[in-house]
Amino acid sequence: MRRRVFSSQDWRASGWDGMGFFSRRTFCGRSGRSCRGQLVQVSRPEVSAGSLLLPAPQAEDHSSRILYPRPKSLLPKMMNADMDAVDAENQVELEEKTRLINQVLELQHTLEDLSARVDAVKEENLKLKSENQVLGQYIENLMSASSVFQTTDTKSKRK
């Protein structure tokens, strides 16, 4: 998060606070835009021997020049109500996500079971096909052998 600090020339955002600290208002957020301000205290710069020590400016009422956030007494009530609504909404969403995840897991297990069953049926089908082929050849051999016997039987009866 970027923090933009107003320069000391911005009389609305900075000034001496009367306790020896230089107050500077910073704004958090992208491109210097934000909805909340922070007050940063920076200690007074060291005075060199060649400079003059000027007295701290008199504390004046600059309240009309500085934008203050909403009164603190309203914030907790509004935030608690909003947070309760958000928490309830998040709880409902979390329960819905959990239900959907469980449903997906159950469907995955069912799909795995069906896939295993399909594989088993394919194996059984191949096994039965090979057995049918063997039985078919056996039947053909029996029929050809029986036809040989039938032809010999009819010839023997004719004699």
Swiss-Prot record:
It is found in: Golgi apparatus membrane; Golgi apparatus, trans-Golgi network; Cytoplasm, Cytosol. GO terms for biological process: positive regulation of macroautophagy; regulation of protein complex stability. Keywords: Coiled coil, Cytoplasm, Golgi apparatus, Membrane. Widely expressed with highest levels in brain, heart and skeletal muscle. Residues 78-146 form a coiled coil. InterPro entries: SCOC. Changing K97L: Causes trimerization and impairs interaction with FEZ1 coiled coil but does not impair interaction with full-length FEZ1. It is a peripheral membrane protein. Belongs to the SCOC family. This is Short coiled-coil protein. It comes from Homo sapiens.
